[in-house]
Amino acid sequence: RLVSRSSVLVMALLMLTACGYHLRGAIDLPEALKTIYVKSASPELSTAIERAFRATTGEIVTSPDQAGMILNVLDEYFQRRTISLSSTGFSNEYELVYRLTFDLLDSEGNTLVSNQTIEVTDSYFNAQRSSTVLSKDNEEIVLRKELYESAVRSVIQRARAELMKKFP
């Protein structure tokens, strides 16, 4: 009976890996993206990049000379705006917007992607009740983190696409 449970568990794990299943946030990096140098990123973006690369075999390097790719952050913009009001005039729903403008350079300093912008958005409901203020603040913090992570995934996808064009 113990053998059959173990066999079922092993078979389930094999089927998961065979279907391409991977953990959320895990990214398969091409060789040129395994070492990246990040220039001029905010602390929040730097943290999201570190988390993304920690889940892979990639590494963030401290010098552009060591990098297979260079991410040059040109501009970052974060905004929270009201998208609906209650009958008493308080904000009920907010939209969070994160916009990242960047260049991607290869290891020789050649531009792969120039002046690209990624914009990610999310919204959340806030009833403005004193009992939920703290939880809504925490919800916004989590959503901000997810927006940064989404932007990082988009940068990596664009980098991968450009590398496929360069090295088919």
Predicted features, each with a name:
Residues A26-A32:
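Membrane-proximal juxtamembrane linkers immediately C-terminal to transmembrane helices
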Residues M15-A18:
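C-terminal motif of bacterial Sec signal peptides marking the signal peptidase cleavage site
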Residues A32-Y77:
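N-terminal segment of the mature soluble domain
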